[in-house]
Regions:
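Positively charged, polar, low-complexity stretches
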Residues: 1-81
Length: 81
């Protein structure tokens, strides 16, 4: 694993195991094949607070920022959440 991926892996570790799993899934299965804009969006998405991420991923509140919403939607459709 390269240094950037290792840093992202660490940043995917959250205060909730469920978030760890969802964000880790994206990193493991989608990140490498993403374009540079999506990679940058994922990195900034990881700067958000856990409660906000959780609400977006559970569909409780909409994610208004389009680049993040694309990632959130992809994660949500992974398990038909």
């Amino acid at each position: 694993m390269n240094t950037d991926a290792s840093r992202l892996r660490w940043r995917c570790r959250r205060g909730m195991r469920e978030l760890d799993q969802l964000l880790g899934w994206y990193l493991d299965t989608r990140y490498a094949g993403s374009d540079d804009a999506a990679k940058a969006a994922f990195s900034t998405l990881l700067d958000q607070q856990d409660p906000e991420l959780w609400d977006w991923l559970m569909g409780r509140t909409p994610c208004e920022f389009l680049p993040w919403r694309r990632i959130v939607d992809e994660i949500r459709t992974r398990d038909h959440i």
